[in-house]
């Protein structure tokens, strides 16, 4: 068959295990089980999404035709590697952020792999984060280009609103953060702010009696190394593209048992 394993020997019934080669948070088990079901491979036992794993852990035990197992091996492992890497990176950022701000939410962005967004967002949630938006239709969100097209922040914020969707406004300065709050934004995204700028914006909103009226989100160049610094600034949400575009994959291998 096209894209089958051209080197496979005649098929026979075999058992196999998928083994972790790294330490982190397991994700993708539910997705891979669907793949194996389609290939008529029986999952005899498995760990669950969200479980901690370490090198040498058997995460799945399989039984099926050897040609089916070999044909699905790489796709299954790639899914586990990618999703577990994202879940692990998310869990690390959540732990570091909540160490200094127990209520802060760590969220993903739309900086995802084409065609794989739903699984990457799923992995973020397994790691303890928030999926944030899946598409432009999920939230009224005014970004810099929307404001540029409208001509000004004031004009952009006249967008038709609905009680079913919050309005989020991306700002690049403390002054615009104040304007957005005064114009009725529900969520203010402080984009590419330094921690010092975040602290200034939060304090100015508080001084004007606006802090409790808005959700403050920080975004832009947030990594595991600096997430705690931003979390300490009394923000509500920290969104990071890192967890989907730069999270290291967690390695796995499949072994056919003799």
From Swiss-Prot:
MF terms (GO), sorted A to Z: nicotinate-nucleotide diphosphorylase (carboxylating) activity
Cellular component terms per the entry's GO annotation: cytoplasm
Reaction catalysis annotation: nicotinate beta-D-ribonucleotide + CO2 + diphosphate = quinolinate + 5-phospho-alpha-D-ribose 1-diphosphate + 2 H(+)
Binding sites annotated in the UniProt record for substrate: 74, 109-111, 133, 143, 170, 191, 219-221, 240-242
InterPro entries in the record: Aldolase_TIM, NadC, NadC/ModD, Nicotinate_pribotase-like_C, Quinolinate_PRibosylTase_N_sf, Quinolinate_PRibosylTrfase_C, Quinolinate_PRibosylTrfase_N
Pathway, per record: Cofactor biosynthesis; NAD(+) biosynthesis; nicotinate D-ribonucleotide from quinolinate: step 1/1
Keyword terms of this UniProt record: Glycosyltransferase, Pyridine nucleotide biosynthesis, Transferase
EC number: 2.4.2.19
Top-level taxon: Archaea
Pfam families tied to this protein: QRPTase_C (PF01729), QRPTase_N (PF02749)
Gene Ontology biological process: NAD biosynthetic process; quinolinate catabolic process
PANTHER family for the chain: NICOTINATE-NUCLEOTIDE PYROPHOSPHORYLASE [CARBOXYLATING]
Job of this protein: Involved in the catabolism of quinolinic acid (QA).
UniProt-recorded name of the protein: Probable nicotinate-nucleotide pyrophosphorylase [carboxylating]
Organism, scientific name: Archaeoglobus fulgidus (strain ATCC 49558 / DSM 4304 / JCM 9628 / NBRC 100126 / VC-16)
Gene from which this protein is expressed: nadC
